[in-house]
Amino acid sequence: MKQTKTKYGKMKQIVSNLKLPDYRYEQLTKAIFHQRIDNFDDMHILPKVLRMSLVNEFGKNVSSVIPVFSQDSKQAQKLLFELTDGERIEAVGLKYKQGWESFCISSQCGCGFGCRFCATGSAGFKRNLTADEITDQLLYFYFNDHRLNSISFMGMGEAFANPELFDAVKILTDQNLFGLSQRRITISTIGIIPGIQSLTQKFPQVNLAFSLHSPFESQRSDLMPINKRFPLNQVMKTLDEHIIHTGRRVFIAYIMLEGINDSKEHAEAVVGLLKNRGSWEHLYHIDLIPYNSTDKTTFKFQSSNAIKQFCSTLKKAGISATVRTQFGSEISAACGQLCYENEL
C-alpha cells in the first residue's frame, strides 16, 4: 500500500480511521479553502473528536510554516519562514495593477547547483521541502487574505531536483484544494532534462521557464555547472519536444551580466540558438532580466541602454523578447537575490 505523504491524504485517512462519513473531509477542506480557517479548533462544523485528532496530528494550525521576518516594498513582500526542524526558506508576494497577485515560492532549503550569479547557491543545499512545506507557503498568504492568482517556482532551489515537486503541483491543481489552473503555475529550471520530460507528461499545461544566461556551452558551464551534466544542446532538444507535445510557449530567462554575457556576439548567438529549430520556434520567448546586485556575488548590474540594444537585436531577427519588469530588488526579493539569513 502506498504511504500517505501529504497532509491532505492524512486528513482523509483520519476521517476514515474515525469511521466518520466522507463528507466530513469535504467540510474540512471547505473550511480551509473556502472559509480560510487556519486553526483546527475554530472549525466548529467538524465534530470535536475530529478536531482533536487533527490537532494531535498536525498541531493547532493547518499551515506548518512560521513567518519570522517580513520585509515590504511598494509592490513586493518578502517573507522568511521557519520550518518545523528550524530550517528557513523565503517566499515573495508580488502585487500588480488591477489587483493581480503573484507568488514566488521555494522548493528547497538552499540550493546545491552553484550558479555563480545566484545568492541562493551561496548558501549551499540543506534539504528538499516536502509537498506540504511547498504549498504551506501559499497557505500563509491565502490565510492572510491574499488572492492566489499565479504561482511561480522561482524561489530558493531547483524545483525539478525535488522528488516531491509534482505532489505539490497535484495539491495546487486539485479542485477540492487550491484549485489552481495549470496555466497559472510556472516552474523554472536550470535545465534538468528528466524533470522537463516529466512535466511534459504529467502537467503539460503548466508553464515552463528555462534559465539560459549564455548561448555558449563553455561559458554556460562556467556560470552554471549543471551545463556539464545536461549540455545546452541537449536541453534545447528536450524543450523542442516539450513544445511539440504541449503546444505551449517556453519562457527563456536571460540575466544580463555586465561585460559577461551582454555583447552583440551573445545576442547573435541567442538568435542562432532559437532560429531554424522548426515550425514551433515562435513559441520560444526570451525574458531579459537586469541583474540584481547582491553581496554574495561580484557581478554588476547592466545598463538599461545595453539591455535595450540586446533586445533590439533579438527582435530584428524575429525572436519574441521582452525586458522583464523587476519588483522587490530594493528588499533583495528579486530574481537571484533570495538567500535566507539567520538574523536579518
UniProtKB/Swiss-Prot annotation:
Domain of life the protein comes from: Bacteria
Location within or outside the cell: Cytoplasm
Annotated protein name in UniProt: Ribosomal RNA large subunit methyltransferase Cfr
Gene Ontology molecular functions: 4 iron, 4 sulfur cluster binding; metal ion binding; rRNA (adenine) methyltransferase activity; rRNA binding
Classification via SUPFAM superfamilies: Radical SAM enzymes (SSF102114)
Reactions the enzyme catalyzes: adenosine(2503) in 23S rRNA + 2 reduced [2Fe-2S]-[ferredoxin] + 2 S-adenosyl-L-methionine = 8-methyladenosine(2503) in 23S rRNA + 5'-deoxyadenosine + L-methionine + 2 oxidized [2Fe-2S]-[ferredoxin] + S-adenosyl-L-homocysteine
PANTHER family in UniProt: 23S RRNA METHYLTRANSFERASE, RADICAL SAM CORE DOMAIN-CONTAINING PROTEIN
HAMAP family assigned: 23SrRNA_methyltr_Cfr
Keywords: 4Fe-4S, Antibiotic resistance, Cytoplasm, Disulfide bond, Iron, Iron-sulfur, Metal-binding, Methyltransferase, rRNA processing, S-adenosyl-L-methionine, Transferase
